[in-house]
Amino acid sequence: MGRKEDNIEKALKIVEHTELIRNIGIVAHIDHGKTTLSDNLIAGAGMMSEELAGKQLVLDYDEQEQARGITINAAVASMVHTFQGKEYLINLIDTPGHVDFGGDVTRAMRAVDGVIVVVDSVEGVMPQTETVIRQALREHVKPVLFINKIDRLINELRLNSDEMQKRFTKIITDVNRLISKYAPQQFTKEWQVSVQDGRVAFGSAYNNWAISIPAMAETKITFKDIVEYVKNGKQKELAQKNQLHKIILNMVIRHLPDPKTAQSYRIKQIWKGDLDSEIGKAMINCDYKGPVAMMVTKIIIDPHAGEIAIGRLFSGTVKKGTDLYISGAGKGKVQTLAMMVGPDRIPVDEITAGNIAAIVGLKGAIAGATVSSLENMVPFEPMIHYSEPVVTLAIEAKHTADLPRLIEVLRDISKADPSIQVDINQETGEHLISGMGELHLDVTLYRIKNDYKVEVETSDPIVVYRETVEKKGGPFEGKSPNKHNRFYFEVEPLKPEVIQAIEDGDIPQGSKFKDKKALVELLVSKGIDRDEAKGLVCVEGTNMMFDVTRGIQYLDETMELLIEAFVEVMNRGPLANEKVFGVKARLVDAKLHEDSIHRGPAQVIPAGRNSIYGAMCEAKRVLLEPVQRVFINVPQEEMGAAINEIQQRRGIIEDMKQEGDEISLTAKVPVAGMFGFASAIRGATGGKVLWSFENAGYQKVPPELQDSIVRSIRERKGLRQEPYDADYYASM
């Protein structure tokens, strides 16, 4: 253990010097070599033995991660590296590449200022590479590039040095295209990666070597020499001359920003408070003397210590015993403070601005929470998750006595991983857990059984559907039970560009808008009429409610209740009680009783609800199902088997490319058709297949299947078989 503590000892001398700190992440498509690279960097910095690097997978410390050979949690390691005679502290966060764990990537990006993008030289830039680059750039995180598995180009594809360089050029061009597309405007040119200035490195993480143009100038090794070393089995020798960790960490220190530099442009992206306030200035300057401002990016549930909140400290100094306020959860006292190295927490007395801290004592904090020494700090912007849960399981305790424990465990799990949603089905009393895919739920169930020791039984996986409308419906009259109040709503589909702006986080959720003027301008730019935009009342999920009435008496007093009715309908659609997607509801008229006693919640909420439901019935209700884009690489002779497997699952082939004997297929497949796909595609192609996928939003269920799917959902939820029609809502 000694070397780790020594390292933390060195680190503690550096923590107050922000110019010597780098907070970095490593991102990549699944299996492109992220964790292997992380372990090499940790070994090189003396945190574990060099022989084990790449084989030990320090950051894959979860039993499941080692068994599955993929990274599931975003782990943290702090290490020290000497560059040009100075010691630097590097806080490294390893993130998962598997699409099911995208939530962890989003959270890790908030904690870091720079990122190493790893690309497999054989596969090139893949869909998940694009997703993680987009996530990093959205958080104003600066990239550098490491092209990995060069030995495969030489040994498997038999490329010479010229052919290799052609391939590198293509990868670099692809990455720069994505940077141009997604980088903040002021950085689209400045953040382009180039070989010449050393922002790109090449190598083999597994074999511990790397090379970059600045390193070539020092060692006089050329690409031709590299081909010879690899061909002749001399990669160990190559690794001694060009140590991976030195080349990569030198690149990080040279080209990725320190916390103070990064916070000068990142704070206004991630925090919408007053930048001229005391805390605003302290964060922009990364000032350790200012008030404490920290964002929790991960909660680890430790069997001994309980909840550990890990997060990025943007200003101030945290010490043992400090009282801190947690957004939405009251006050907590710092009991212990530590720096993290994979699974180990090394205790420290204090941590200053610009660092990553692990704190015990912030009870009630969740990933995404704002922690501050000020009671009323404006919270950080919520983190945008690129994918919503698409698969649900019903879960129950095997032994009734374990039920209270199961409820506690589910609460812990949803704290530690906010991309897992836990709901209780009010009708049946069963617990539902929803995640990003089959693997995500498998891993969660494994944790419940093995880490928390609760025996559970689960249903088959259930797909998460959405409801929408196809055309305009209403105005539809909704009457209150006492018949003294009437509301008239219209509904229609929301424009795709408005839905996109909501999903990107440009349009905030809820009904309290900080800068209504700017929001109106944004809506007008997306094609919404100005008068209508001014009447925006509420955003719920990807749906919006507008009030376009004029001068109706007492309406202001009932608006909160109408918002409640709207939110309820958007979370329980009229077809199958599934969430509603992409619908605009407009209140166009209302008739209200003058006596407030006759327009309380029990009158207004049902009237508003029936008006929106009725208008949706008139607007042709449609069921949407989640779809995934699937990417498959197979030898030519297995192409037929792969296409057949896709088509059996209602999939559509969108694209097909050939490179040598390899065929690359891109297909769109409903999530409902993807269960068991992994073993089926391996079986069909005799194991000769590489495949991956990403969530690709929702599409309409084929009309011939809609009725039967709606019926089966309603049956599962204990509802009457047929959905109610417009006449029913009119008669209420």
Swiss-Prot record:
One Pfam family assigned to this protein is EFG_C
Task: Output the Gene Ontology terms for molecular function.
Answer: GTP binding; GTPase activity; translation elongation factor activity
Q: Which Gene3D superfamilies match?
A: 3.30.230.10, 3.30.70.240, Elongation Factor G (Translational Gtpase), domain 3 (3.30.70.870), P-loop containing nucleotide triphosphate hydrolases (3.40.50.300), Translation factors (2.40.30.10)
Cellular localization per UniProt: Cytoplasm
Record keywords, A-Z: Cytoplasm, Elongation factor, GTP-binding, Nucleotide-binding, Protein biosynthesis
Q: Which residues carry this modification: Diphthamide?
A: H598
User: Would you tell me the protein name for this molecule?
Assistant: Elongation factor 2
Q: Which family does it belong to?
A: Belongs to the TRAFAC class translation factor GTPase superfamily. Classic translation factor GTPase family. EF-G/EF-2 subfamily.
At the highest ranks, the source species' classification is: Archaea, Methanobacteriati, Thermoplasmatota, Thermoplasmata, Thermoplasmatales
Q: Known PROSITE patterns for this protein?
A: G_TR_1, G_TR_2
Sites binding GTP sit at 28-35, 94-98, 148-151
Please give the function described in this protein's UniProt entry.
Catalyzes the GTP-dependent ribosomal translocation step during translation elongation. During this step, the ribosome changes from the pre-translocational (PRE) to the post-translocational (POST) state as the newly formed A-site-bound peptidyl-tRNA and P-site-bound deacylated tRNA move to the P and E sites, respectively. Catalyzes the coordinated movement of the two tRNA molecules, the mRNA and conformational changes in the ribosome.
Q: Which InterPro entries match?
A: EFG_II, EFG_III/V, EFG_V-like, EFTu-like_2, G_TR_CS, P-loop_NTPase, Ribosomal_Su5_D2-typ_SF, Ribsml_uS5_D2-typ_fold_subgr
Ranges where the tr-type G domain occurs: 19-228
Q: Which SUPFAM superfamilies match?
A: EF-G C-terminal domain-like, P-loop containing nucleoside triphosphate hydrolases, Ribosomal protein S5 domain 2-like, Translation proteins
GO cellular component terms listed in the entry, alphabetical order: cytosol; ribonucleoprotein complex
Q: CDD domains per the record? A: aeEF2_snRNP_like_IV (cd01681), EF2 (cd01885), EF2_II (cd16268), EF2_snRNP_III (cd16261), Elongation_Factor_C (cd01514)
